[in-house]
Design a protein with these regions (language model features):
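Long, well-ordered alpha-helical segments
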Residues: 194-200, 204-205, 210-211, 249-253, ...
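Active-site-adjacent "gating/activation" loops or surface patches in catalytic cores
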Residues: 158-170, 278-353, 358-362, 465
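Post-HEXXH active-site segment of zinc metalloproteases
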Residues: 350-351, 362-387
Length: 562
């Protein structure tokens, strides 16, 4: 019988029940029954993560529901309690005198992850973790509360997208002004929220013995194979190789359109003819995706059919729904769920194929032996998502209007390249923020403008007050909710673009290599997974150089010096 999302029901954990179950793990360890203890430990974590994922998903589906908010707050309060038990058991196993027996039961990578995990928690920061989760939830709810008037309708921030991509320049400018009016109105509250988050995180780092939050954040992200200096070198690679190409792309657009100046509201209009739209509404797109994945072969089609028929998709934008898109999973049943906000633009296709990449990877690696291995660290996970965006290119005729597939492909490539400077801008901003946690809100806004001048030198807000004064970063939820995550998109995109290059030479080989990468799940750290896939590490000097050259040729743009 096919699994249906509507029938999923994960027991609500209590502190008492959790203490009992984790206590059973300790008892088994006391009896030297390591294999049984590890099996129970894994089961408990799968049960808890499934319930927690469902709780977060339901809140995202309706942020206005008091019941959903209450349950999410309850989950946030449980997280430090559960983490304390998990860390204690991990520490006990890592300190076990019979490391040969432990090593026989757990992979070296799992043990390395656990060594990292035990340095990120202590009962002294339990209250701070709960406060961090609460403040992050406040940001989500505030952004979801936006009610914006434009074009005779009331929309949320996601609903602005069709206006922001209009071929009418005045409409795009209006959308930009409406967007930033919301952030200007809520700017002081957003500044206060962020200030509290920065100090909560800085205090946690101090309590755990770190010099600054950055080092703790890297460990929380389970980055066991690279550090801030490696990331700084990658940022310079982007600045050296990608920023000049994006500048030329934007200058060609300005000249083509005959504009005296290119403003921020002109950047979303990637194609002067108007950004290609997908072939129809939500229902049509979902149906056409089935044809596309069936055509790609292998088990992509059958997997997507399971998701579609089982109700594991929530793609339509609606009032009260949290913004953005994500993929979550329920490890007790081995089935992922895709959440998105379709808004009628080409972005719907990008978000959908991106989250489908996450979902497919999680499904392919569902049989790996430990819950720690079901997902890669997020840097590697984003390769799976972004690579699928490019691997679906040959089938875009199914997803966009007739004759617009090639325009879509060019637009997707330009959008991907343009993202890289913004991605490293966000990352550099965060490194500076947490190096100086006592900055005032005004200093943080000045810092953002400094970062924009460094990585986005073309950016001109046309005098719109809030972003011109350095407030653009407040719209980037990752900065509030997931510090230091954003660079993962840029690192992964460097790798995904190599899949694009490979697919242009041999689509079948690229797809085989992609499936193999998905099957590995989180069985190795980022740089090892990259190497196993035959990709060049983003941290290697010149990693982006050849990709940028091929992209420039594809787009018929001469690079500086050519």
């Amino acid at each position: 019988m096919a699994l249906r999302f509507s029938e999923l029901d994960f027991p609500r954990p209590t502190r008492e029940r959790l203490a009992l179950r984790f206590g059973q793990v300790s008892t088994l360890l006391d009896q030297d029954r390591r294999a049984d203890a590890l099996m129970l430990f894994d089961t408990i974590r799968r049960d808890y993560e499934s319930w927690s994922a469902m709780t977060d998903l339901r809140f995202s589906q309706d942020t206005t529901s008091a019941a959903n908010r209450e349950e999410r707050d309850y989950a946030d309060s449980l997280t430090p309690y559960v983490t304390a038990f998990e860390v204690a058991i991990k520490r006990r196993l890592l300190d076990d005198p019979d490391q040969q027996a432990v090593g026989a039961a757990l992979s070296p990578h799992t043990l390395e992850l656990w060594r990292t995990d035990i340095t990120t928690f202590d009962s002294r920061i339990a209250d701070a973790l709960e406060e961090e989760a609460r403040l992050s939830g406040e940001y989500t709810a505030l952004i979801a509360s936006a009610r914006l008037s434009i074009g005779g309708e009331i929309v949320n921030l996601s609903g602005l997208a069709p206006y922001a991509e209009s071929t009418d320049r005045a409409t795009r400018e209006q959308a930009e002004r409406v967007r930033w009016e919301f952030f200007a109105t809520n700017g002081p509250q957003l500044d206060t929220l962020f200030d509290r988050l920065v100090h909560v995180r800085a205090d946690m780092a101090t309590a755990l013995g770190y010099d600054a939050y950055t080092a703790l954040a890297y460990r929380r992200m389970r980055r066991v194979d690279y550090g801030p200096q490696d990331v700084a070198r990658f940022r310079e690679e982007v600045r050296t190789h990608v920023v000049p190409l994006v500048q030329r792309i934007l200058e060609r657009r300005r000249a083509t359109m005959g504009w005296e100046c290119l403003y921020s509201w002109d950047e979303p209009l990637i194609d002067p003819m108007g950004n290609p739209r997908h072939i129809g509404g939500h229902d049509v797109l979902v149906r056409q995706a089935q044809v596309m994945f069936d055509r790609m072969g292998g088990d992509l089609g059958p997997f997507y059919r399971q998701m579609r028929e089982g109700g594991f998709l929530d793609l339509q934008n609606r009032e009260g729904k949290a913004g953005g898109g994500f993929c979550t999973s329920f490890p007790t049943v081995g089935m992922p769920f895709i959440f998105a906000n379709f808004n009628g633009t080409q972005h719907d296709i990008n978000v959908f194929t991106h989250e489908m990449g996450h979902a497919y990877q999680n499904w392919k690696s569902r049989g790996l032996p430990a819950v720690d291995l079901l997902w890669p660290t997020m840097d590697a996970a984003e390769i799976n998502s972004m690579a699928l965006e490019f691997l679906t290119w040959p089938h875009m005729d199914l997803m966009v209007a007739q004759g617009e597939a090639e325009r879509f492909r060019q637009m997707h490539l330009i959008g991907s390249l343009s993202f890289l400077p913004y991605g490293v801008c966000v990352d550099h901003f965060q490194h500076e923020i947490y190096a100086r946690p006592d900055m005032t809100p005004a200093q943080r806004h000045d810092l953002w403008r400094e970062m924009e001048r460094r990585y986005l030198p073309w950016r001109d807000y046309g005098g719109i007050a809030h972003p011109s004064a350095g407030g653009r970063w407040q719209a980037q939820g990752h900065i509030y909710r997931s510090p230091f995550y954003y660079i993962d998109y840029a690192l992964a995109l460097c790798c995904a673009l190599q899949f694009w290059q490979r697919s242009r030479a041999d689509q079948d080989r690229a797809l085989r290599d992609y499936v193999a990468l998905c099957e590995r799940g989180g069985s190795a750290p980022f740089t090892d997974l990259v190497r196993q896939a035959g990709l060049t590490s983003p941290f290697q000097p010149g990693a982006l150089e050849e990709t940028v050259r091929e992209a420039a040729r594809y787009l018929n743009i001469a690079l500086p010096g050519e």
